[in-house]
């Protein structure tokens, strides 16, 4: 487990490394990591935030999660609510997921804003126990379409694509 100050730093550091591996990810900012780690003064759930880091054999942080347990009234169980989960390697991601799904006295893990290809469905024995929901999150307006497309790399670059864009605002 990590102290909240350390958790905020690790989340930011890992996000910066991991976001370059996935198109469309944006940079984070210190206030975001402080909020995820439970350091925001207005956060009513801040006291309940916990953090865990997954380290490789050299001791480097490769995955981390900020979460809180929400007790289910009348039961001796809780829902584990993930605030932020980040990993810069497949092994670290599997390690963090393993920690979450094997947490004591938890009968539900709730995670928002995961990629559609997140491997959790394939990491559990009962795939029917995993429920996913797809919804919009990041919206953006690309002002320079050619520059945006040229900044990416593409597999199978022998392909030629013609793209038309109509934007009444410019």
Predicted regions and their residues:
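Intrinsically disordered, low-complexity, positively biased terminal segments
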Residues: 2-170
């Amino acid at each position: 487990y990590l102290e909240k100050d350390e958790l905020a730093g690790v989340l930011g550091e890992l996000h910066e490394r991991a976001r370059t591996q996935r198109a469309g990810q944006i940079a984070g900012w210190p206030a975001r990591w402080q909020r995820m780690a439970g350091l925001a003064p207005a956060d009513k759930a801040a006291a309940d935030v916990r953090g865990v880091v997954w380290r490789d054999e050299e001791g480097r942080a490769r995955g981390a999660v900020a979460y809180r347990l929400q007790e289910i009234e009348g039961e001796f169980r809780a829902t584990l609510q993930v605030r932020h989960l980040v990993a810069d390697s497949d092994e670290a991601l599997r390690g963090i997921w393993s920690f979450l799904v094997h947490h004591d006295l938890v009968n539900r893990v709730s995670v928002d804003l995961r990629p559609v290809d997140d491997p959790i469905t394939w990491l559990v024995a009962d795939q029917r126990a995993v429920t996913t929901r797809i919804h919009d999150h990041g919206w953006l307006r690309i002002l320079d379409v050619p520059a945006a497309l040229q900044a990416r790399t593409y597999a199978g670059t022998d392909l030629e694509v013609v793209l038309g864009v109509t934007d009444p605002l410019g």
